[in-house]
Amino acid sequence: MARKRRAARVKDKWTLKKWFTLIAPEYFGMAELGETPADDASKVVGRTVETTLAELTNDYSNQNTYKKLIFKVYRVAGDNAYTKFWRFELTREYLNSLTRRRTSKIEDIVDVTTADGYKLRVKSVVFTVRRCKTSQKRAIRAIMRQIVVEKASSLNFVQFLQECVLGKVPAEIYKNAKKIYPIRRVEIRKIELLAEPAEAETQPAVAEAVA
């Protein structure tokens, strides 16, 4: 009997829950990211959902399947749970596939502020064709940091995120860093949201969808 009553209580908990549709930000076309259950809308706020750029844009070409986007619920209206960008990162498997023996891996981590006041932590990585000298690593790292900081300060949050995710920032780093030493690959491997401007905390950003 005790087992039956316990099973009934578990069943009752699930019957009290409802499903909320997770919605991507406007600059990602307000695409549906999935569903999450809760017995109270307030419990949905703060939850995170992970997807890939391929799933989000329905484009499985290039490296889109290796690019992960994590969104965080900030508002619930009716059955919809609206999310904001929380983190971008490349999968560990993809990064491991880029590592080669007798080559150099150069990384940089820098905190930046976009033109519209978003504070982000950006982690970039460069893979060289062969092992390079310490002085060359230092010069390449300086280029990586300079380009990331300058891009962030001249673009708004959505523009900067788009240029990082779609490869424009890595391409610019590649173009400049190869003058120091032959480069095999450049990636923005991670972007973390540290802080938003005050106005963004109460209303979602409005921008064109990322294509």
From Swiss-Prot:
GO terms for cellular component: ribonucleoprotein complex; ribosome. InterPro entries: Ribosomal_eS1, Ribosomal_eS1_arc, Ribosomal_eS1_CS. It comes from the Archaea. Keywords: Ribonucleoprotein, Ribosomal protein. One of its GO terms (molecular function) is structural constituent of ribosome. GO terms for biological process: translation. It holds the Pfam family Ribosomal_S3Ae. The keyword Ribonucleoprotein applies. Belongs to the eukaryotic ribosomal protein eS1 family. This is Small ribosomal subunit protein eS1. The gene is rps3ae.
